[in-house]
Amino acid sequence: MHIVENNKIQNTCLIFIEVESLAQQTKLENDYEEFCSLVSSCDTRIKEKIKLNQKIPSTKTFISQGKLENIKTVISQNDIDLIIINHKLTASQNRNLELYLNKRVIDKTELILDIFASRATSHIGKLQVELAQLNHLSTRLIRGWTHLERQKGGIGL
């Protein structure tokens, strides 16, 4: 579950979303710099940085539909493999973004866990990080098997 898979450095798009209902204006610039330095500490190639302003996050994708269209065109023009968003996404938001953009999307929590995983040196440290990653992943598995919910049943089946 690492950002770098198969020793291939991925082309990354950073999406920094300023949500008015969640943010304090004085912290935003520091948050942007912190987010960029977090991503630069991973083995990725940052090809694009997108800064968005939004009043209220969308419950379906966290990003409004019009801005998603713009992001999709930027991604297709720049050969992007990975999208990193500076907010914590719900499992359904993450899944909806990945389905819409056809790219891997990770949030800030997954990014931080991946950084810890790449830098853990002791056996116990590696196990603790892996446990944290699996706990985070377990919340993402909900509704992943909805295609099996309506199975046929009856006598002889």
Over which residues does each language-model region extend?
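N-terminal accessory targeting/assembly segments
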Residues: 1-114
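Extended, highly charged alpha-helical segments
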Residues: 111-157
